[in-house]
């Protein structure tokens, strides 16, 4: 089979299709796998291509957190929540730059997505709820292993049962279009090795119905992210897996997809100085330190931010200080993630002290000032006051029970809220806000849902919501005829 391609292959050469399927999915993280499961369930033949040697992308190395209003645990604990409250939290964190129709779909379908993962795929959650910065209530679930590996295993196992092949080490180089601008396939380099950028051969795969782009973000693509924000150079590390680069996004932009919010790049304020990427240190800071402790500038001994603020506000406060800051908590607060604490103590990511004065000395913090800071903070908690940063301390954790714990924090690039524009059907749109026929996208490769910044535990949930939408609509060839 041959087809005259426009604007992608040089000199409009007639090409030979090496293979064909109904739906091509690029990326094997939670967004891509959710899309593939739905497309196959709808009767389409599906092939998933993954550029790395292992499946899962950032999902695999995530902490397995999923935010959803009205989830089962909230009902059991009589926590009042709603899609509307979630929606408002999303807009606030996103500085109201969110594409509201997309944020609304996400907020309204989040609980269903989390339920689908458990009921249909067997993913289990811990018997705990967390309230991370920017969320109005505790609505964040975590997988039983405290890892996204549970999700990857469940989804890839289901795809195997369904007869869907995931081909690793296959790099997307081009999205192929016909003379009418309809996406009709992909160009893939097989045998791709991320370490040396090598590949064996190039293949053209025809998609008889649609292509779904689920290639994730570009947090580890330093040259590309510096084009968007020159401040995020090599001195700012990333929590992402090595394959979090911009090839998929670039391929879509090349055929006319509209870029949305590319310069808004999220940094995680819980970045642990004493580890590479996102490990037990960052996890401990996220799940225990920020919810139950304080963040102090070591040069002054004073707090610098509302520890429950969204990620952008906390990161900006640390960047403003100009050096790593110190997170401090007591034994009771640290107990909220005892599993991570044990790992962090063994690996030197968290330090333990019997006295607050010893902590101050070790972390080079003015001891008297730190003592005053902690005393003032505890007094406001006892009185149920709101502090100078707007943090309501009625339910905050006292810092009074030894031993005390400290860790050094500096933001790391964690998430890229910007990407290709999509509509509520997960169709990729062009600069005229019109769908590019036969091209869908889901997950971090998309922009607009989160606006300027994303709330914690929202990435996986959002990937499931729009991955499922993309898969169902792609299989039906919705909007592509």
Regions found by a protein language model. Give the residues of each.
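C-terminal structured subdomain/cap of oxidoreductase catalytic cores
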Residues: 17-18, 204, 337, 342-344, ...
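Conserved N-terminal/central alpha/beta ligand/cofactor-binding core
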Residues: 3-6, 10-13, 45, 51-165, ...
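Extreme N-terminal leader/targeting segments of oxidoreductases
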Residues: 1-23, 41, 449, 453, ...
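Hydrophobic, small-residue-rich alpha-helical packing segments that form membrane-like cores
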Residues: 148-157, 173-202, 210, 219
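Glycine-rich loop(s) and the adjacent beta-strand/alpha-helix scaffold that form part
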Residues: 193-194, 198-202, 206-274, 466-469, ...
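An anion/pyrophosphate-binding glycine-rich loop and adjacent beta-alpha core
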Residues: 249-369
């Amino acid at each position: 089979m041959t087809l005259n391609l426009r604007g992608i292959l040089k000199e409009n050469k007639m090409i030979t299709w090496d293979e064909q399927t109904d739906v091509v999915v690029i990326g094997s993280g939670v967004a891509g796998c959710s899309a593939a499961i739905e497309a196959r369930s709808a009767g389409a033949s599906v092939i998933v291509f993954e550029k790395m040697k292992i499946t899962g992308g950032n999902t695999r190395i995530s902490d397995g957190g999923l935010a959803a209003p009205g989830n089962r645990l909230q009902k059991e604990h009589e926590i009042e929540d709603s899609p509307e409250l979630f929606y408002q939290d999303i807009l606030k964190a996103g500085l109201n730059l969110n594409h509201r129709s997309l944020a609304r779909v996400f907020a309204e379908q989040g609980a269903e997505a989390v339920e689908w993962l458990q009921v249909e795929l067997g993913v289990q959650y811990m018997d705990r709820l967390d309230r991370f910065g920017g969320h109005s209530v505790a609505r964040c679930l975590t997988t039983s292993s405290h890892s996204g590996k549970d999700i990857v295993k469940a989804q890839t196992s289901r795809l195997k049962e369904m007869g869907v092949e995931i081909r690793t080490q296959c790099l997307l180089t081009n999205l192929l279009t016909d003379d009418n601008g309809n996406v009709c396939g992909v160009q893939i380099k097989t045998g791709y090795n991320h370490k040396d950028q090598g590949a064996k051969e190039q293949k053209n795969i025809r998609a008889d119905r649609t292509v779904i782009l689920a290639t994730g973000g570009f947090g580890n693509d330093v040259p590309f992210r510096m084009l968007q924000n020159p401040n995020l150079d090599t001195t700012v590390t990333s929590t992402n897996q090595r394959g979090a680069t911009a090839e998929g996004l670039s391929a879509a932009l090349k055929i006319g997809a509209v870029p949305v919010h590319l310069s808004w790049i999220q940094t995680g304020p819980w970045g642990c100085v004493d580890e590479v990427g996102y490990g037990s240190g960052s996890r401990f800071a996220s799940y225990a330190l920020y919810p139950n402790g304080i963040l102090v500038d070591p040069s002054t001994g004073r707090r610098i931010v509302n520890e429950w603020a969204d990620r952008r506000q906390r990161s900006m406060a640390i960047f403003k200080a100009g050096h790593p800051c110190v997170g401090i908590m007591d034994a009771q607060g640290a107990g909220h993630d005892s599993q991570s604490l044990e790992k962090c103590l063994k690996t030197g990511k968290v330090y333990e002290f019997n006295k607050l004065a010893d902590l101050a000395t070790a972390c080079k913090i003015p001891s008297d000032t730190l003592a005053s800071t902690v005393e003032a903070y505890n007094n406001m908690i006892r009185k149920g006051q709101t502090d100078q940063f707007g943090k309501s301390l009625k339910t905050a954790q006292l810092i009074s029970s030894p031993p005390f714990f400290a860790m050094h924090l500096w933001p790391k690039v964690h998430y890229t809220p910007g990407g290709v524009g999509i509509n509520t059907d997960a169709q990729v749109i062009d600069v005229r806000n019109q769908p590019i026929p036969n091209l869908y996208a889901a997950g971090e490769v998309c922009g607009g849902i989160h606006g300027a910044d994303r709330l914690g535990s929202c990435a996986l949930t959002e990937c499931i919501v729009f991955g499922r939408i993309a898969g169902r609509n792609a299989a039906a060839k919705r909007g592509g005829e």
